[in-house]
C-alpha cells in the first residue's frame, strides 16, 4: 500500500515540468533554435566567468575535502561569508548562526514552512504564485489559503489579507519580484502589510511569520526591492543562486532567519530540526564554496531587459494590456 497523497503527486507532475519535458522532446525533433520554452526558469545567460574560475581553483586546492560532508547548516566559513554579505548589503546584524545553506530556495521554503507551523495551521500565499507552494504546505500538514493580489498592479491587497489572517494563520509566503508576473512589492505596500501583521499579532495572540521567497531578487529593471526583514522582523528569507549566478541545476542557496526577530535562535533551532526531518543532509559542498568566492558577483540582466523590451513593445503594439514586469 503506497501513500495516496504521494502517489497522486507522482502520477500528476506539475504542469511546469510536463511542459519542460515536452519542450525537450520538441527540441530534439525540430532543433532547439525553433522552440521557445517559457515553462521552467532555466536562465538564458551563462554563469559568470568567476564561477568557472572558482570551480577550477577549488578542484586544485581542496581535492580531499571538496566532496565530503559539511555540517547540516553548511560550511561555517561559507555561512560567515553569507552573513557578512547580508550585513554589508542590507545593514542588518546578520550572524552566521542564523544562516542555513540549502539546496536552492525550494529546500529553504520546505524547511521554513515546516519549522514555523504545526499540522492544522494555515499558510497564506498570494495569487498568482509558484504552484509548488501548495505541495510544500500540504506536506507540512497545513491548509493553504490563497489571497489574490490587488489588480491591476499586483501589490499586496491589505484588505483581503486582513480578512484572511485568522486564529490558525501561522505564516504568509511573499514572493517579490513575483513569479510569474514580475511585480515588485513597494516599500509603502510592505509597510502597510507590516502594520497589519502587528495588529493581527496583538489581536490573535500569536506570532505571524513571513517567509520571503527571493530567487529573483537580482533580476530587476530599476525597481527598488525592499529587504523584508527590515520591514517585518519576523521574516525568514529563502534565497537562491539559481537565477543570480545562472546555477539552477547546482541547487545552492540559503535561508536566513532574521536576527531582528525576538525569537531568532528558537526559529533557527526549529529550522535545523526541520532540515533533519525532511532528509536534508547538507547543501552541495562544491557550490557552497563557489558561492563564498562569488558572493559579490553582479548579475547580468542585460539580456533579460532586452527580452522584456522586445516582448512588451510587441504585445503593446498588438493591443494587449498588461503590467510591465519590474523584475523576474
Labelled PLM ranges:
Residues 2-104, 111, 294-301:
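N-terminal small-domain helix-loop-helix segment of the aminotransferase-like
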Residues 25-31, 89-91, 196-208, 259-265:
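Alpha-helix termini
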Residues 35-37, 238, 321-326:
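Short beta-strand
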Residues 57-61, 257-262, 283-303:
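Amphipathic alpha-helix from the class-I
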Residues 63-202, 217-232, 236:
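Conserved core of the PLP fold type I
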Residues 227-267:
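Active-site PLP attachment segment
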Residues 245-249, 264-289:
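Active-site region of PLP-dependent enzymes
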Residues 285-292, 304-316, 322-328:
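Conserved glycine-rich beta-strand-loop-beta hairpin in the small C-terminal domain of fold type I
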Amino acid at each position: 500500500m503506497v501513500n495516496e497523497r504521494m502517489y497522486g503527486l507522482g502520477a500528476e507532475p506539475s504542469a511546469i515540468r510536463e511542459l519542460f519535458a515536452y519542450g525537450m522532446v520538441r527540441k530534439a525533433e525540430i532543433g532547439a533554435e525553433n522552440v521557445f520554452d517559457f515553462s521552467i526558469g532555466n536562465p538564458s545567460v551563462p554563469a559568470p566567468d568567476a564561477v568557472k574560475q572558482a570551480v577550477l581553483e577549488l578542484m586544485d586546492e581542496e581535492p580531499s575535502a571538496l566532496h565530503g560532508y559539511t555540517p547540516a547548516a553548511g560550511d561555517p566559513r561559507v555561512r560567515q561569508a553569507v552573513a557578512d554579505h547580508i550585513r554589508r548589503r542590507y545593514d542588518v546584524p546578520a550572524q552566521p548562526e542564523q544562516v542555513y545553506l540549502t539546496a536552492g530556495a525550494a529546500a529553504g521554503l520546505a524547511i521554513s514552512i515546516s519549522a514555523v507551523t504545526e499540522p492544522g495551521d494555515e499558510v497564506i500565499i498570494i495569487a498568482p504564485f509558484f504552484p509548488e507552494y501548495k505541495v510544500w504546505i500540504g506536506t507540512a500538514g497545513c491548509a493553504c489559503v490563497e489571497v489574490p493580489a490587488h489588480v491591476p498592479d499586483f501589490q499586496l491587497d491589505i484588505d483581503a489579507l486582513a480578512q484572511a489572517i485568522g486564529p490558525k494563520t501561522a505564516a504568509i509566503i511573499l514572493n517579490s519580484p513575483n513569479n510569474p508576473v514580475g511585480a515588485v512589492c513597494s516599500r509603502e505596500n510592505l509597510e502597510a502589510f507590516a502594520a497589519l501583521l502587528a495588529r493581527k499579532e496583538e489581536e490573535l495572540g500569536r506570532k505571524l511569520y513571513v517567509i520571503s521567497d527571493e530567487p529573483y531578487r537580482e533580476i530587476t529593471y530599476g525597481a527598488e526591492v525592499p529587504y523584508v526583514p527590515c520591514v517585518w522582523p519576523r521574516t525568514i528569507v529563502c534565497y537562491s543562486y539559481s537565477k543570480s549566478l545562472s546555477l539552477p541545476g547546482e541547487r545552492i542557496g540559503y535561508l536566513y532567519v532574521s536576527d531582528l526577530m525576538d525569537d531568532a535562535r528558537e526559529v533557527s533551532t526549529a529550522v535545523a530540526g526541520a532540515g533533519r526531518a525532511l532528509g536534508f543532509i547538507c547543501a552541495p559542498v562544491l557550490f557552497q564554496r563557489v558561492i563564498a568566492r562569488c558572493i559579490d558577483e553582479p548579475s547580468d540582466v542585460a539580456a533579460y531587459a532586452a527580452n522584456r523590451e522586445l516582448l512588451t513593445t510587441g504585445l503593446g503594439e498588438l493591443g494587449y494590456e498588461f503590467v510591465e514586469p519590474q523584475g523576474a
